[in-house]
């Protein structure tokens, strides 16, 4: 008998509810084709939660997420709530507390150049023609953003500011394991990013990654300095499979990876804890300027569902079916307006219908 799964669905603001509706269509197709028992509960988060409950992350939403196997998150924020105190705004008051509450230490950001979308890549045509499919694995809770001491002191010519890069062995070990396990589901290559020629934290990082790699003899490991990595991503992104990064370096490289794909509407994201409980969301924002127009690209939200199936539900076959359905739609020239470039475009609803149908049919 198949296991019962429960997903907390948090559509949020802006285009969030529209693109989430398409992901739920695809979830229905997955249920039917793979005989998976998946139930969902919907909760307010972000600006809509402020309007309805007076807080961007209501207690009922947190409690609902605690009862779920994973969180499928839309997007939060918009001009309506920009003048609130920073800690009460949708982004800071909802997403960051959720990450902290569930101890989500790893961030996974796929960046893929899909066949037929090479013209959107800002790289040279001969580089884009090779394509790329990269997974950036970023450590989220350690490093220079959180290390102590940090602050400012002194005055005049002696005023100074300081931050501290701190990593513990256990933090590096667990994010490295995520990267190697992910590589086993892909092309079996990890490139670990550091600055071990200068930084003590990077020397420790490299030593521990080498130790973890011994448990994964089937996965190729390479090390690369961060400055070289930023250049190699421009020169030949096809050389990379999984990038393993500290918090700071991952922040930089994941955005660079996103930019060279040419479309934020195609980029999902996953944040996981040690139990592989995860929060899955599009990498883009709430896009309030196009909300309600039925023109938003839902693919990033649908791919976030695929990540959820793969990492939190261990349903790799279902995740692959979604990815293949999206590939098929794009290869057939199906485009939302952000990808159409003057050609005929389908609506948000139509793109969701097509992908759900292709999942149900199989490719």
UniProtKB/Swiss-Prot annotation:
Locate the residues binding Mg(2+). Answer: 227, 251, 255
Give a yes or no for keyword Oxidoreductase in this entry.
yes
Q: E.C. number, please? A: 1.1.1.85
**UniProt-listed PROSITE patterns:** IDH_IMDH
Q: Which InterPro entries match?
A: IsoCit/isopropylmalate_DH_CS, IsoPropMal-DH-like_dom, Isopropylmalate_DH
Record text on cofactor binding: Binds 1 Mg(2+) or Mn(2+) ion per subunit.
Supply the name of the protein: 3-isopropylmalate dehydrogenase
Q: Which organism is it from?
A: Salmonella typhi
């Amino acid at each position: 008998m198949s296991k019962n799964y429960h997903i907390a669905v948090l559509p949020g603001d802006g285009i969030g509810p529209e693109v989430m509706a398409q992901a739920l269509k695809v979830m229905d197709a997955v249920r039917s084709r793979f005989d998976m028992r998946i139930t969902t509960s919907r909760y307010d988060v972000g600006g809509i939660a402020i309007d309805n409950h007076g807080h961007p992350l209501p207690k009922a939403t947190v409690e609902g997420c605690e009862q779920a196997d994973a969180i499928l998150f839309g997007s939060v924020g918009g001009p309506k709530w920009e003048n609130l105190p920073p800690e009460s705004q949708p982004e800071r008051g909802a997403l960051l507390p959720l990450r902290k509450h569930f101890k989500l230490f790893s961030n996974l950001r796929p960046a893929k150049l899909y066949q037929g979308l090479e013209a959107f890549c800002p790289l040279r045509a001969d580089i884009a023609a090779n394509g790329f499919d990269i997974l950036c694995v970023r450590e989220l809770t350690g490093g220079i953003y959180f290390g102590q001491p940090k602050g400012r002191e002194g005055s005049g010519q002696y005023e100074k500011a300081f931050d501290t890069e701190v990593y513990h062995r256990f933090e590096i070990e667990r994010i490295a394991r995520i990267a190697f396990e992910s590589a086993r589901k892909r092309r079996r290559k990890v490139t670990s990013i550091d600055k071990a020629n200068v930084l003590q934290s990077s020397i420790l990082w490299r030593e521990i990654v080498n130790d973890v790699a011994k448990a994964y003899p089937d996965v190729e490991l390479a090390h690369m300095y961060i400055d070289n990595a930023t250049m190699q991503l421009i020169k030949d992104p096809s050389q990379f499979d999984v990038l393993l990064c500290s918090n700071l370096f991952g922040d930089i490289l994941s955005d660079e990876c996103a930019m060279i794909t040419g479309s934020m509407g195609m980029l999902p994201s996953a944040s996981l804890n040690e139990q592989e409980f995860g929060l899955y969301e599009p990498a883009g924002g709430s896009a309030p300027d196009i909300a309600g127009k039925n023109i938003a690209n839902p693919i990033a939200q649908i791919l976030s569902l695929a990540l959820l199936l793969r990492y939190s539900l261990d349903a790799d076959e279902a995740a692959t079916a979604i990815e293949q359905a999206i590939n098929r739609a794009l290869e057939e020239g199906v485009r939302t307006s952000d990808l159409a470039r003057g050609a005929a475009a389908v609506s948000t609803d139509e793109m969701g219908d097509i992908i759900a149908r292709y999942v149900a049919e199989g490719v």
